[in-house]
């Protein structure tokens, strides 16, 4: 499954300004963040919970930010 992280990416820029600042607040490298946002590495549950805290959204919104499937155009 391929997930669409565009809403998450938008929230990152809105709250943190840059992906680099978000990665720093998450205690992960920018490379790791990039791999996660490009569906090369999975997000772990504690990382999703921490992201919700850093980006100030409710845990009930995790589905919107992390589990929206990417629609493929053929």
List the model feature ranges, each with a label:
Residues 46-62:
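DNA major-groove recognition helix of helix-turn-helix/homeodomain DNA-binding modules
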Residues 19, 30, 48:
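Helix-turn-helix DNA-binding elements, focusing on the entry/boundary residues of the two helices
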Residues 5-25:
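Short basic helix-loop element that most often maps to the first helix and adjoining turn
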Residues 28-43:
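Recognition helix of helix-turn-helix/homeodomain-like DNA-binding domains
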Residues 3-4, 43:
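Alpha-helix N-cap/N′ positions at the starts of helices
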Residues 1-2, 10, 15, 35, ...:
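Short, charged recognition helix plus adjacent turn
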Residues 16, 42-45:
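Residue at a beta-strand N-cap/secondary-structure junction
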């Amino acid at each position: 499954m391929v997930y669409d992280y565009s809403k998450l990416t938008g929230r990152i820029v809105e709250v943190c300004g840059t992906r680099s600042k978000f990665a720093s607040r998450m205690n992960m490298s920018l490379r790791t963040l990039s791999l996660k946002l490009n569906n090369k590495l999975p997000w772990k549950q504690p990382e999703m919970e921490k992201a919700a805290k850093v980006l100030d959204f409710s845990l009930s919104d995790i589905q919107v930010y992390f589990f929206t499937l990417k629609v493929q155009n053929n």
